[in-house]
Amino acid sequence: MPTSTDRSTALVIGGTGPTGPAIVQGLEARDHRVTVFHTGRHELDLVSHVEHIHGDPFSTDGVVAALGNRTFDVVVACYGRLRVIAEVLAGQCGRFVSVGGTPAYRGYFDPTRFDPIGLPVPTGEDAPRSGEDDDGKSYRVARTEDRLFEHQPDAIHLRYPFVYGPRQIAPLDWCIVRRVLDGRSAIIVPDAGLMAETRAYSENAAHVVLCAVDTPAAGGRCFNVGDEESLTTAQRIALICAELGHEMEVVGMPTDLALPARPLMMQVEPGHRILDLSATRDVLGYRDLVSAREAVGI
């Protein structure tokens, strides 16, 4: 284990995505000496001042070649092949915080996995997870969690929902903004836009990661990540239009007919996707840094 006699050391795997810079800055504010490990394909001025290790975080050989026998007080794994990273760094770090995703929950992509159809509302960390009879991606996400705790039993694992904000490579709200910029007077959405979904503003998601770093006693378990308020589609549309000074009618249609809304909704079947954040608040001490209603307009 690390025995550094000066500042604590922190390794951030990733560091240049939607939540990376805020995580790096938060660790520095906690007096950690931060190193970023990523491929080097997407550099960012916000984290250019810290040590960078460039390599392949997706393979065992790549992680070993990049990190060798280096040790760290804290590892925050936001990128790469998590099951490989967890195994290679076993015994080389004091604390391990990792980021996964809500597809670990059974039915997150396909709510027909439940009878009657629909995810549990709210979905807590103990909800059924995806199995081999679910879609392959969801099962692999859940299986990776198992492999993580095999190698890092005291890890804190965070289940990200869809993250929005700066540097998001697939900004769903662009589907709304583009129509506003085009001067459209209406937008088609399923079921009058009443579906509610927990998402996470990038600054808020990074704050959960930092709360996890601050709470080592919570090791060995998973936590949901998200804004404290789960907005409906119609609310997101209204907030964006208000910010841009545009009026646009929400035209509700049955889900089967609202095909133009598929890229915005990112799901075929209707249903709420609301995460239970009770443990995140009560155990990790999380509270929104930016409210969902404010963040949507940023």
Please report, for each region that a protein language model flagged, where it lies by residue:
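Mid/C-terminal beta-alpha module of Rossmann-like enzyme folds, strongest
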Residues: 211-272, 277
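Amphipathic terminal alpha-helices
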Residues: 291-298
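Active-site "gating" loop of Rossmann-like NAD(P)-dependent oxidoreductase/epimerase domains
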Residues: 101-139, 143, 149-150
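Glycine-rich Rossmann NAD(P)(H)-binding loop
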Residues: 13, 165, 189-195, 223-230, ...
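Substrate-positioning beta->alpha
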Residues: 171-176, 189-213, 220-221, 297
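Conserved beta-loop-beta element that borders a ligand/cofactor-binding pocket
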Residues: 144-167
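Conserved Rossmann-fold cofactor-binding substructure of NAD(P)-dependent oxidoreductases
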Residues: 51-77, 86
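N-terminal Rossmann NAD(P)H-binding glycine-rich loop of SDR-like oxidoreductase domains
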Residues: 8-30
